[in-house]
From Swiss-Prot:
Keywords: Cell membrane, Membrane, Transmembrane, Transmembrane helix. GO terms for cellular component: plasma membrane. The chain crosses the membrane at residues 7-27, 274-294, 435-455, 467-487. It comes from Methanocaldococcus jannaschii (strain ATCC 43067 / DSM 2661 / JAL-1 / JCM 10045 / NBRC 100440) (Methanococcus jannaschii). InterPro entries: DUF2207, YciQ-like_C. This is Uncharacterized protein MJ1577. The keyword NADP does not apply. It is a multi-pass membrane protein. The keyword Cell membrane applies.
């Protein structure tokens, strides 16, 4: 495939990933992907001598016979009868629109109050409470499950005795109305200031709208699943009952915490839209990098070439540079080198995979070919190399990890990672564009890691983190592209690359290759050697079999079967021996919990 098509496909792919990622990230508020959510949450918070909270939850149940409990829990001690000498919430009453549901309260101790005369219902609720270790919860239970989809309403009334920070100038209360809850589609909170006690009000998340009204304040918004909802207030001293503790400079700490929250929130919101823009524009960015560092000159090369484009090019270099992704070397390069050394009279491939060493003068060989010959000579006996001997050595070295690792490294050097591969690649390719892609990948990963560890005050923080993951995925796709796509071939090597591709196409076409005469053995030998280097040696062998060129076919089959087995054996033994082992501001409020269902 020519690189023009490759870059278009890559850009289209990362664009699709970006659009889908943004859609899933920004639309996932829980309501579209759940069988129940809270359509309307309305609360009246009375700021009088006591802090009184009235709540109405309107559940929309989308799937019948799945839920049997609608509840409101607290992350604060809940009492039904009596009082505590620490901050707590007291239940005054509860009601529901459904006659089929039974109310219950589970206090902070686990004591259960069921508003039914039926003993079996009480036992059922007790079993559920024990099973889920329920505490600090008030709600309604339907023993026959909620059968029909529809709207179901529950309401509660509480008196809250919160922790209060004071410096004798201000009272500070931070009330968390929810933090782990179903999605709230519509939120409306009326803060009713009965005695004009509120001096300042701070609402979390900052995306909620706050209106000043004749009775106090109205707060409106929408809350995704588990998004915190908090109301923080500065009040006149001695205006509300609660549990006070002295804190120096209450006003300063409150305002400082809120400013910090809004500052971070604004940064995160800006980062959200910036990431969305980068994600959507990233295909264009990738294309610009390609134009700057990867776009090649146009060459006219036929689709098929029946001759070896460059016979002076060593088979292992053809495998490393032209067979696929430049810089990726595989065992076919090693096998092609063995066939080439056999053809040039340095070795003789024998039955059973053995190799007879015919020449020991390595002066005319390059570095990689010398490494191959040195390996064969080092582990040969009487100038005959036997792959079975390498297998036996691997078994022998099981108890000596250092010797086994040395053997594996020697084998890897000739079958996977030739020396000086990077220098060879740099001789053919200018890789600055690919380095930019790798740098972008590293930056995207560091950003995602940073965002993972910062506190998640609201859904927006989660969205930014998920968007960073989308950006990482886009960069991974680019990083996995061939080196040559964002690199530029030096000199006229791109033309040679196209010629090797055309030659590979020819060798892959059985009908075309079989047209050539079997008498010209030298041509078939070249085709087998370079076809192996290009990864299509099996196609050449298939044609040879049909033309009865059995001798050449035998060499290919012997090498593959015996040396595949040798490499696998060493890797397997090595793997078995190494193994593997094994307050103030947002989030600081009193209360928590929220509306749920089970």
């Amino acid at each position: 495939m020519r690189e023009e098509k490759e870059i278009i496909i890559v850009c289209l792919l990362i664009f699709i990933v970006g659009v889908v990622g943004i859609f899933l990230t920004t639309s996932f508020n829980g309501m579209k992907y759940t069988s129940i959510y809270i359509k309307d949450y309305e609360a009246n918070l009375y700021i009088g001598k006591n802090l009184t909270l009235e709540e109405i939850y309107s559940y929309e149940v989308l799937e019948g016979r799945k839920y049997r409990m609608l509840y409101r829990d607290w992350k604060a001690p809940l009492v039904y009868n009596g009082s505590l000498n620490t901050p707590y919430v007291k239940v005054l009453n509860l009601s529901t629109s459904s006659k089929d549901m039974v109310g219950y309260v589970v206090d902070y101790k686990g004591d259960i109050f069921v508003f039914s005369d039926e003993d079996w219902i009480k036992r059922n609720i007790e079993e559920i409470v024990d099973k889920y270790y329920i505490r600090n919860e008030v709600g309604f239970y339907n023993p026959l499950y909620i059968r029909n989809p529809g709207i179901y309403t529950t309401s509660y009334k509480f008196v809250i005795y919160p922790p209060i920070e004071t410096d004798n100038v201000f009272y500070h209360i931070n009330l968390k109305l929810a933090d782990e809850h179903l999605p709230y589609k519509n939120v409306k909170i009326n803060v009713i200031d009965e005695n004009n006690s509120i001096l300042d009000l701070f609402v979390y998340p900052s995306t909620f709208k706050v209106y000043k009204t004749y009775f106090g304040y109205t707060i409106e918004g929408s809350s995704p699943k588990n998004d915190p909802i908090e109301v923080e207030m500065l009040l006149k001293p001695n205006s509300v009952n609660g549990f006070t503790r002295y804190v120096y400079n209450v006003e300063g700490k409150t305002i400082s915490a809120y400013k910090k929250y809004t500052f971070v929130s604004n940064i995160v919101m800006t980062l959200k839209y910036l990431l969305m823009a980068i994600i959507l524009l990233f295909p264009l960015i990738a294309y610009i990098i390609y134009l700057k560092f990867g776009k090649e000159k146009f060459y006219v090369v036929p689709e098929y070439l029946s001759y070896v484009p460059n016979k002076n090019r060593k088979p292992w270099i053809v495998n490393l540079i032209f067979a696929g992704d430049a810089g990726f070397f595989d065992k076919e390069g090693f096998y092609a080198t063995l066939l080439d050394l056999h053809n040039r009279g340095y070795i003789k491939i024998m039955n059973g995979g053995k190799i007879e060493i015919l020449k020991t003068d390595l002066e005319n060989l390059d570095v990689y070919e010398s490494d191959v010959m040195k390996f064969l000579m080092k582990y040969s006996k009487n100038n005959v190399f036997d792959p079975e001997y390498i297998k036996s050595l691997a078994q022998k070295y099981k108890s000596s990890k250092d010797k086994l690792k040395k053997l594996k490294d020697e084998l890897d050097k000739i079958m996977e990672y030739p020396r000086y591969s990077s220098k060879v690649v740099n001789a053919f390719l200018e890789t600055r564009g690919k380095k930019i892609i790798i740098a972008l990948l590293v930056i995207s990963i560091l950003l995602a890691v940073f965002l993972y560890f910062i506190p998640k005050y609201s859904q927006t923080f989660n969205e930014v983190f998920y968007l960073s993951i989308v950006f990482v995925v886009q960069n991974i796709i680019l990083a996995l592209t061939p080196t040559s796509l964002f690199g530029r071939w030096k000199a006229n090597y791109y033309k040679e690359k196209l010629e090797w591709d055309a030659f590979k196409n020819f060798l892959s076409n059985l009908a075309m290759i079989k047209k050539y005469s079997p008498e010209d053995i030298s041509i078939w030998k070249d085709w087998l050697i370079y076809g192996t280097a290009l990864g299509v040696g099996d196609k050449v062998v298939e044609a040879m079999k049909s033309l009865n060129l059995s001798e050449l076919v035998a060499d290919y089959v012997i090498i593959h079967s015996n040396y595949d087995s040798m490499k696998t054996s060493v890797d397997s033994v090595y793997s078995s021996t190494t193994g593997s082992g094994g307050g103030f501001g947002a989030g600081g409020g009193f209360g928590g919990g929220g509306g749920g269902a089970r």
